[in-house]
């Protein structure tokens, strides 16, 4: 039976982005008490749990390839009264990481979802950019190439709010060139 308040509860737990010291005390408490931890990568989550002194946790891999199948397993455990924590490799589950479809399925099945907030790459990038923070939008990763990428950039070119994008370091130079082509050289950009 669950040791978290509320049996059959799914808890999204934000994890550190690069600095394990950013794991909150509340996150450690929830992860310690969870009957099951759904995670993007069991090896990386194992390292995080070890750092926090958490042992004996039951882990279930939930990534972009397994999220749909894993949702059924999570719902079954919730229906048995288990508490399930969800983590990704870094940051908040569901933000350009697995979790969104899982949460939708759990809510549709009538279970409660809670969150332990914490590190968030979009917010960290936004506040350290020096760009306006009162109105902004999160776009995640752009399509990698072709018409989908060109089309998305054209849509974003008319956006007046600050736009937060994710990009891999190896594609950053090409993306900056594409942004300049779509938005013009006068639009400010910050890389965080």
Predicted regions and their residues:
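Short glycine-rich anion-binding loops that position phosphate/pyrophosphate groups of nucleotides
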Residues: 17-18, 89-93, 169-171
